[in-house]
A protein has these predicted regions:
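Hydrophobic alpha-helical membrane-insertion segments, chiefly the h-region
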Residues: 22-32
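N-terminal, intrinsically disordered, polar/charged segments of Gram-positive cell-envelope systems
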Residues: 33-88, 286
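Conserved SGNH/GDSL esterase-like catalytic core that processes O-acyl groups on lipids
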Residues: 79-170
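A short helix->loop->beta-strand "cap" motif at the edges of active sites that frequently abuts
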Residues: 182-186
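Catalytic His-Asp segment of secreted/periplasmic serine-dependent ester chemistry enzymes
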Residues: 195-286
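Alpha/beta-hydrolase-fold catalytic nucleophile elbow
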Residues: 153, 190-191
Length: 286
């Protein structure tokens, strides 16, 4: 009988061996996968938080190192001064200031006034006669005087000048000259006084609109040069903005009543002392 291959069904021990080999392969693959995976980051320790101290609050009432500069204003009302206040005053002006000398009743101070004087002629024209008969400028005469306060009023004779630039230039030059000659003196610019309604209606260059424009120049120059400015005009201005007829001879120059109002205003608007000085002294005594 020729030989034949006979197939036999595998035994159970071969099946068990195959199963064990498959299980081992799966376990090895799982181990490789686990080794390739990155390890989890270890938990970080919590860092302490630094708390900055709060900035200290500065009380509002603590004064600053540099005091704020007080705004410039015209001379304010103060307690009335007696006439000795005017002992060291030099009054500088034109015919209006000469009228004040004659009709105010003030018998103190020294007067340097020339009829027709202007801010230009005060420095450029030798129209002041000295005691020994020499002719010098008004500015030179004031320079030689011993005074602690200079009260200046000029401008009525310049109202016909073109615009205000020429007036401003000469007025500033005069103020600088007075300051240079008397560096320790109080320079007080007095406002120009208004004219009457009758004079204002004439159509002349001597009118209240021009006077207001010149007063604006004086006020600006006083601030720029560090001088005082006394608004005399408000003492002799009526509700219509004009000089009351009962205060003037001719609508331009003041009579006795007008000069008294002028002097009273000067007495209650003094310079060289705080406006509240009298009240503070009285409070300290009481």
């Amino acid at each position: 009988m020729t030989g034949k291959r006979i197939w036999r069904k595998p035994g159970r021990h071969w099946l068990l061996l195959a199963a064990l080999l498959a299980a081992g392969a799966l376990a090895a693959a799982a181990a490789r996968s686990s080794a390739a995976a990155p390890a989890e980051n270890p938990p970080q320790e919590e860092q302490p938080v630094t708390v900055l101290p709060a900035e200290p609050e500065i009380p509002a009432d603590v004064p600053a190192d540099v005091p704020e500069e007080m705004p410039w204003t015209p001379v304010q009302e103060s307690e009335p001064v007696d006439d000795s206040y005017f002992d060291d005053v030099a009054f500088v002006g034109d015919s209006r200031t000469d009228g004040f000398r004659l009709y105010s009743g003030l018998e103190r101070g020294t007067y340097f006034c020339v009829t027709g004087e202007t801010v230009a002629s005060a420095t450029d024209m030798e129209n002041w006669k000295t005691e020994d008969g020499r002719k010098i400028s008004l500015a030179d005469a004031v320079a030689a005087a011993d005074c602690g306060k200079i009260y200046l009023m000029l401008g009525i004779n310049e109202l016909g000048w073109n615009g205000t630039d020429i007036f401003r230039s000469h007025a500033e030059n005069l103020l600088r000259r007075l300051q240079a000659d008397h560096p320790d003196a109080e320079i007080v610019v007095q406002s120009l006084l208004p004219v009457s309604a009758e004079q204002d209606a004439k159509g002349s260059y001597v009118n209240n609109q021009r006077i207001l424009a010149y007063n604006q120049v004086w006020m600006e120059l006083a601030e720029e040069t560090g001088c005082d400015y006394v608004n005399i005009a408000e003492a002799v201005t009526g509700e219509d903005g004009c000089l009351p007829a009962e205060m003037s001879f001719d609508g331009v120059h003041l009579n006795r009543a007008g000069c008294h109002a002028w002097l009273d205003y000067l007495r209650t608007h003094s310079v060289g002392q705080p406006s509240g000085e009298h009240q503070e002294t009285a409070a300290a005594v009481s």
